[in-house]
Amino acid sequence: MNATSMTFDEAIEQVGYGRFQTKLMIICGLGWAADAMEVLLISFALPAIAAEWGLTIAQRGLLGTAIFLGMLAGALFWGRLSDLIGRKVGFVSTIAIDSIFGLLSAFAPSFGWLVALRTMTGFGVGGTLPVDYSIFAEYLPSERRGRYLVLLEAFWALGVIAAAGLAWLIVPNFGWRWLLAVSAVPGLIIFVIRRQIPESPRFLLVNGQPEKARAVLELVARTNGTQLPDRPLRPIERTTPPGARELLRPGLRRTTLLLWTMWFTISLGYYGVFTWLPTFFSSSGMQLLPVYQNTFILALAQLPGYFSAAYLVEKWGRRPTLAFYLTASGVFTYLFAAANSINMIVAMGIWMSFFTLGAWGALYAYTPEAYPTALRGTGMGAASGWTRISGAIAPSLGAALMVGGLNLVLPLTIFAVSFIVGGAAALGLPRETTNKPLADTLEGM
């Protein structure tokens, strides 16, 4: 190999972090915010929908489950597709799918139609999450990657806050259909903007297109006001065929199984609580307006959780941050269950929200770093798929929380234990990825 050639990571270090990555983070982040709105809208609208259509507890659980079934299929399909034909197709298509079907949901004539449309909305959302993380991670220098991947997750909190705020303003005055319609508009706008982002240069290089990869890197350098050295990119030999079964091959099996455990448990705990949160408050005797006010307060607590995790993943490392935040999530979920007044429920809920969403951010930072380029999208898609399985289970399990009003100790204890199991899994991860370059092949890990 020519001694004057440079690796992809050396090239990324040369172009640096600047306007291009900031623009990409905002574009990815706004898509994430739009997706967060779509995922949690039904939980915010559920009391109003149930009242209008007279839904049973089982029907409410099915409606909450629908989007996660779509997200499971979407995560597996789009994650795999992004490793085969590139990140760009899924990056653009997924946000269009979830926004179009999200808008159509506002016009659902019946319960069955609403379930079907929310499932299709989930198919788009399920692809956006893993594809966005893969493409953004592949544009980042190693020393900034963890912090900015967690900050990207902060946009999810902005979406939750926006959804809670819109529900507070719209549902009591105009009804749930207007909430669904208004919330779909941002995604349609973001779809148009996303088309200008080029394909991942790392993907291009791994797939034998060094000229195209260099052209993209030169674009990044010009945007950032830097210069790419006049040296050829060192080819990356793909020695690991892309395929889901490769995630369980020796060298990756332990990491994959532990990551799947964490994704499953954090999703079960998070959606088990938050899908039903407005309904929990309603069951305590709150009127509709205070329900949305308290939900909005808990949503606000997510932002500082993300920002603290963004700092600690670089200061402490990915693994200890994950373990601490997941364990703390479990502790405060139990205290949330044991609280005997609305004020204490809200106070413990704030800390639960803080730590849970910080854990999400750290997990999204670690997972794409755990896999080589040829498997990164597939790995993210498979891991994300486990959240869709537990997310689909959580609403039905959460239906039990409505029995007996605020007597929520047993089911919420299950969710608390789920978080703690995830924290234990984090301690078993074999690799710390802080400040390390992304691997392109399994042999390079």
Regions found by a protein language model. Name each.
Residues 1-445:
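Transmembrane-helix signature of 12-pass secondary carriers
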